[in-house]
Regions:
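N-terminal secretory signal peptides that target proteins for export/translocation
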Residues: 1-2
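Bacterial N-terminal signal peptides
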Residues: 5-17
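Exported/periplasmic ABC-transporter solute-binding proteins
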Residues: 22-64, 71-75, 84-92, 96-97, ...
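Phosphate-/polyanion-interacting regions in eukaryotic proteins
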Residues: 80
Length: 255
């Protein structure tokens, strides 16, 4: 009889623990979105914890940007974003510094519209010539686009001609404006380009020109379920999660 009572007590404790965090709200930015959209259902299946995902860039002036969402009082248990932007939130006292975990690195890639010829970008000079001969170029308003506009063009000494035919695209995936024919070339983090229909992935830009973006995650200081949030972060560092991240175009980092 006592074993039945003990089993009932343990079951009650486990159910109570799960009930304390049956739903987590996660804000994630573009580069990790494809991976997280695969991982969240797996985590729910394994733990019973429902995950609500809110999307937004790591920075920028759009209302959907994660810092802006948090600033106006939107709730999140976990934020997944560009590491430097996460550090800004940590320094501002918005995210618990002890909760930060490193997840993956992301590199910049290029797409063209499906059916279009793929220009050469296998060397710095080929890449430079491809840019100069392009009719139009689009890139994101997040970390990769900021780098392209402020650093890459200048490094290649083509800032003048490129700025005249380039556009920073807010809110939506860059691939979508290449797919509809609005722009000839599109640049964004690889993980954000691969899921877009109607484009062909040409490849990563030359490694000598890369800007590697680190993705990290943390728990806001006002999270409603901080303990459950940390368990999710542990899962995101697991081998299972790293394998999914790799498939979606990211380069996982070891915990």
């Amino acid at each position: 009889m006592w074993k039945k009572w003990l089993g009932a007590i343990v079951a009650t404790v486990l159910l109570s623990t799960a009930a304390g965090a049956q739903e987590l709200t996660v804000m994630t930015s573009g580069g990790f979105t494809a991976a997280f959209e695969r991982l969240a259902p797996q985590y729910t299946k394994q733990t019973g914890v429902k995950v609500t995902t809110l999307l937004g860039p790591s920075m920028g002036e759009t209302p959907q940007a994660i810092p802006n969402r948090l600033a106006r009082g939107e709730h999140a248990d976990v934020v997944i974003m560009v590491g430097s932007a996460l550090q800004t939130l940590i320094d501002a006292g918005v995210v618990d510094p002890a909760s930060r975990v490193e997840l993956a690195d992301s590199r910049i890639g290029m797409v063209v519209r499906s059916g279009a010829s793929k220009p050469k970008i296998d060397s710095v000079e080929h890449f430079r010539q491809t840019l100069l001969h392009a009719d139009s170029v689009a890139y994101s308003d997040s970390a990769s686009g900021v780098y392209i506009e402020a650093t890459l063009f200048k490094q290649l000494q083509i800032q003048g001609p490129m700025m005249a035919k380039s556009k920073k695209i807010p809110r939506i995936p860059v691939g979508t404006v290449v797919a509809d024919g609005s722009y000839q070339l599109g640049f964004q983090q690889v993980a954000e380009l691969l899921p877009v229909a109607g484009v062909e992935f040409v490849g990563k830009i030359p490694e000598q020109l890369q800007s590697i973006t680190r993705y990290a995650a943390g728990v806001p200081v006002n999270a409603q379920h901080p303990d459950a949030a940390r368990r999710l972060l542990t899962y995101l560092q697991s081998g299972e999660a790293q394998a999914v991240a790799r498939v979606t175009g990211l380069d996982p980092v070891s915990p």
